[in-house]
């Protein structure tokens, strides 16, 4: 049993070995690298780190899970406003020191108020399951530790990407709407002879006089014959505006009615003022 324990201690946990290789790779120093002293490593670009580097070494791309896994091996955040992590046995050029890093024992409180140790010492040194998400290897209370901040950062990054996609969609829809508007203006000015100022009023919701064709304008001075009135339709209405003027029959009818009414009044007046001696009736 002692020989097995010694053999396990001579080999670092897979998570530690992969993390060391990830940090020590100079081709990705713009994303993650050692600090100037070589006593800690810094993640400079969290989004690229999670998207591009984590899947190459681990079975996930969750930055928060990676942080929680560091916590289980005793790493600590050294700078509040920077993703810089350190461990006494994790330093540049000291890969042989990784065997001295021990994994913490997960302790949870039972319903009876007693503490129960999860996992044996041999399991803590073997590093089994390091490649999986740390939600299965860390304690339930770890979300209340600095890992909760990493969760928030990951959520905000995802929300930011979602907003960018929505912004691009809205920009495309706006460009399509502007194109349709330009096509409509071209149609109105080219085919229906609508003046630009009328289009402006139409867009702004204003009111203006209907647009009449040349034939209808000429018929305005014609006599109110029935043939001219029969050929008039209701016209075309667009956005609540008549583009083709409707013949106003009612005005002519009212005009004719006034003329007829005056004639009837004259006749009645003549009858009323007729002399009594011209009456055909004779009183006996």
Curated annotation (Swiss-Prot):
Induction field: By heat stress.
CC annotations in GO: nucleus
Pfam families associated with the record: HSF_DNA-bind
Record region (Disordered): 118-151
Start-end of DNA-binding region: 12-106
SMART domains: HSF (SM00415)
Biased composition (Low complexity): 134-148
Motif mapping: Nuclear localization signal: 247-252
InterPro entries tied to this protein: HSF_DNA-bd, WH-like_DNA-bd_sf, WH_DNA-bd_sf
UniProt PTM comment: Exhibits temperature-dependent phosphorylation.
Assembly mode: Homotrimer.
Protein name per Swiss-Prot or TrEMBL: Heat stress transcription factor B-1
Taxonomic lineage of the native organism: Eukaryota, Viridiplantae, Streptophyta, Embryophyta, Tracheophyta
Gene name of this polypeptide: HSFB1
């Amino acid at each position: 049993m002692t020989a097995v324990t010694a053999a396990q201690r001579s080999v670092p946990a897979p998570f530690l070995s992969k993390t060391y290789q990830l940090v020590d790779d100079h081709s990705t120093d713009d994303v993650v690298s050692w600090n100037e002293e070589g006593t800690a490593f810094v993640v400079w670009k969290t989004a690229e780190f999670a998207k591009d580097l984590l899947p190459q070494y681990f079975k996930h791309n969750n930055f928060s899970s990676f942080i929680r896994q560091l916590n289980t091996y005793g790493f600590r955040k050294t700078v509040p406003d920077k993703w810089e992590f350190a461990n006494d046995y994790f330093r540049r050029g000291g890969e042989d020191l990784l065997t001295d890093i021990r994994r913490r024992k997960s302790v949870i409180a039972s319903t009876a108020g007693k503490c129960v140790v999860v996992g044996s010492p041999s399991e803590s040194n073997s590093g089994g399951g390091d490649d999986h998400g740390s939600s299965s290897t860390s304690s339930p209370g770890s979300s209340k530790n600095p890992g909760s901040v990493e969760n928030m950062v990951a959520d905000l990054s995802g929300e930011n990407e979602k907003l960018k996609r929505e912004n691009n969609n809205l920009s495309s829809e706006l460009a399509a709407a502007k194109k349709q508007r330009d096509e409509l203006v071209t149609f109105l000015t080219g085919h229906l002879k609508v003046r630009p100022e009328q289009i402006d009023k139409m867009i702004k919701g204003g009111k203006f006089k209907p647009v009449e064709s040349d034939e209808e304008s000429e018929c305005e001075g014609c006599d109110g014959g029935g043939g001219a009135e029969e050929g008039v339709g209701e016209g075309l209405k667009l956005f609540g505006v008549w583009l083709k003027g409707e013949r106003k029959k009612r005005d002519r009818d009212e005009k004719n009615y006034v003329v007829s009414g005056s004639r009837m009044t004259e006749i009645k007046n003549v009858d009323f003022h007729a002399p009594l001696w011209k009456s055909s009736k004779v009183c006996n």
